[in-house]
A protein has these predicted regions:
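Aromatic-rich, lipid-facing transmembrane alpha helices and their immediate juxtamembrane interface loops
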Residues: 1-295
Length: 295
């Protein structure tokens, strides 16, 4: 027993409320955005932050009630706000530190803390916890208080194996996304340099041509004409090479962008689509551009 819950109950509750949180997220954003999106951090239908949030509240309530004290709805509401918000804050901070991105952003909400949490959603957390404790948990406990059979443990173990695999795959996908963003940023930087050089060369050629028209009245010699022709030919060659290089870089940029945005069911495109307010610490502009491509 841990905080009044058996190991089986802890495993079961975490799965149930992770799935329940995912359902709530999908429904909420379907209503808000008008389209159904897999809102989970993982590929499967789970949101771990909800599982951890609800379990933390259950652990505290069981500990307090185990000492003989009763919890009022107001106390449950307050504890729900504090604990669930703390879980959301830690989760948001860890994801930011590990993957250099803020997956949700409350910066536009009043009374927010660094965009990780805000008063509005903390209050929603509190109300949701009261509903879970007073309504839903009664039905869940009715199926979880018995001694689990061997087959039930096997099912739980299989589900957690899938959960762990999904987590490993998702981490690999995000690491791959960050590597591609680094490459995209390098290609975009090179593209700007080449485009600037091309613009400068074209401008120099135009000015040079105007100057040579005036010089032709004074320097009417064959040697000067040949020199001008050679210089013009060299510039044309440079311009053509810069145009080819720019086209190659543009093709690379499009290919890399497509390799991200084409995978919207499972993959890097799904991650960006699932978190429309995601802010990347290093490549914010690129993320915004990729979001536009996914609309």
């Amino acid at each position: 027993m841990i905080c009044g819950m058996t190991y089986f109950q802890i495993c079961l509750y975490f799965l149930i409320y992770s799935f329940g949180g995912w359902v709530v997220e999908v429904i909420f954003h379907a209503v808000a955005l008008g389209k159904v999106i897999n809102r989970g951090f993982l590929n499967g239908p789970v949101c771990p932050v909800y599982g951890f949030g609800v379990l933390s509240v259950f652990a505290l309530l069981n500990t307090i009630q185990g000492s003989g004290r009763q919890m009022s709805d107001g106390m449950i509401f307050v504890f729900g706000i504090v604990l669930a918000t703390a879980v959301e804050l830690v989760a948001g901070w860890l994801l930011d530190v590990c993957f250099h991105a803020r997956w949700w952003d409350y910066s536009d909400k009043p009374f927010n803390f660094h965009g990780y949490i805000c008063l509005e959603f903390s209050l929603i957390w509190g109300l949701a916890i009261v509903m879970v404790v007073k309504i839903f948990q009664k039905y869940v406990e009715a199926h979880a208080l018995h001694t689990p059979a061997t087959w039930e443990w096997i099912v739980i173990a299989a589900l957690y194996a899938v959960y762990l695999t999904d987590f490993i795959v998702t981490v690999a996908v995000i690491q791959g996304l960050n590597k591609k963003l680094t490459r995209l940023d390098k290609v975009r930087s090179d593209l700007r340099i080449v485009s600037d050089k091309l613009s400068d060369t074209l401008a120099t050629t135009t000015i040079g041509t105007a100057q040579k028209v005036g010089e032709g009245k004074v320097q009417a010699t064959l040697a000067a004409a040949e020199l001008r022709d050679a210089t013009a030919a060299q510039r044309e060659k440079s311009i053509e090479m810069l145009r080819i290089k720019r086209a190659e870089l543009q093709a690379q940029f499009e290919e890399l962008s497509s390799s991200i945005t084409n995978h919207t069911v499972v993959g890097q495109g799904r991650i960006i689509k699932a978190f429309p307010k995601m802010q990347h610490r290093d490549y914010s502009e690129l993320i915004q551009e990729l979001k536009k491509r996914l609309k």
